[in-house]
Amino acid sequence: MQKVTFPNKILPYFLLAPQIVLTVVFFFWPASQAIYQSFMMREDAFGLKSTFVELANFTAVLSDPNYLHSVQVTVVFNVLTALLAMGVALLLATAADRVIRGQTFYRTLLIWPYAVAPAVAGMLWLFMFNPAMGTFAYLLRRNGIAWDPLLDGNQAMGLVVVAAAWKQISYNFLFFVAGLQAIPKSLIEAAAIDGARGARRFWTIVFPLLAPTSFFLLVVNTVYAFFDTFGIIHAVTGGGPAKATETLVYNDGFVNLNLGSSSAQSVILMAIVIALTAFQFRFVEKRVHYS
């Protein structure tokens, strides 16, 4: 194998510099500020004076019933969003992989939602399911379903889960299609000759060979549901009704101006995501076969 080197030793660093700057500015700096603020407590409304309070913010957060309820809601939302987004994406990718004519058109059509901003995606679903004027809300009422996510917490949770999953389906679809195309067609044809039907071929041949892709998307969707869905939730329900979909970090930090509590919650969430990702790589990856 031929080794490729840059003619100028400084050039690689220049090429990496923009990404390094973005990572430092939009990840490491905010994370360090959140960790710092989690040990501080503001003494005035303008934040001009703060006091070091050690672990008081973490103790208060972990003993707050509202926070514990928020953790439960977050876990339910995360699991449902990841499963729905990956399940629908796999179904669409399998269908698109069988299409002979117009593959490019269908794939382009299915990846468009990923380009929609989270807040815009939330507003679209809010309009469609608005109890007063939404098209789908009208159809639900015509079929005897008392639809009102502004009053029913379960309906509100279902709506934000569907909206968040819809936004992520396109991303998952791209990777599942790539994974399906990488599977040798000779294996599928051999199984068909042996008499294996479509469902059996999928579960015994296709799905196991998609394990690396599925594992990668499981990690990505977990992080997405934790960190990248605020815009959707805030646009669709605003945290209601009755705190059924409340974004407690936002409310404490930007509404109640309690930066210490908000930062402590952010640090705990970051630790949970890191631990969950490490667990996935440590235990789930053992069941993934890459060859």
From Swiss-Prot:
Any one Gene Ontology cellular component term annotated for this protein: plasma membrane
PROSITE patterns from the UniProt entry: ABC_TM1 (PS50928)
Keyword Cell division in annotation: no
Highest taxon in the source lineage: Bacteria
Topological type in the membrane: Multi-pass membrane protein
Record carries keyword Transmembrane: yes
GO BP term, pick one: transmembrane transport
Record's subcellular location: Cell inner membrane
Regions that span the bilayer: 10-30, 73-93, 109-129, 156-178, 205-225, 259-279
Pfam families: BPD_transp_1
Keywords of this entry: Cell inner membrane, Cell membrane, Membrane, Transmembrane, Transmembrane helix, Transport
Start and end residues of each ABC transmembrane type-1 domain: 67-280
Chief site of localization: membrane
NCBIfam families listed in its UniProt record: PRK10561.1
Function of the protein: Part of the ABC transporter complex UgpBAEC involved in sn-glycerol-3-phosphate (G3P) import. Probably responsible for the translocation of the substrate across the membrane.
Record-stated family: Belongs to the binding-protein-dependent transport system permease family.
Subunit comment: The complex is composed of two ATP-binding proteins (UgpC), two transmembrane proteins (UgpA and UgpE) and a solute-binding protein (UgpB).
Descriptive protein name: sn-glycerol-3-phosphate transport system permease protein UgpA
Organism: Brucella melitensis biotype 1 (strain ATCC 23456 / CCUG 17765 / NCTC 10094 / 16M)
Gene responsible for this protein: ugpA
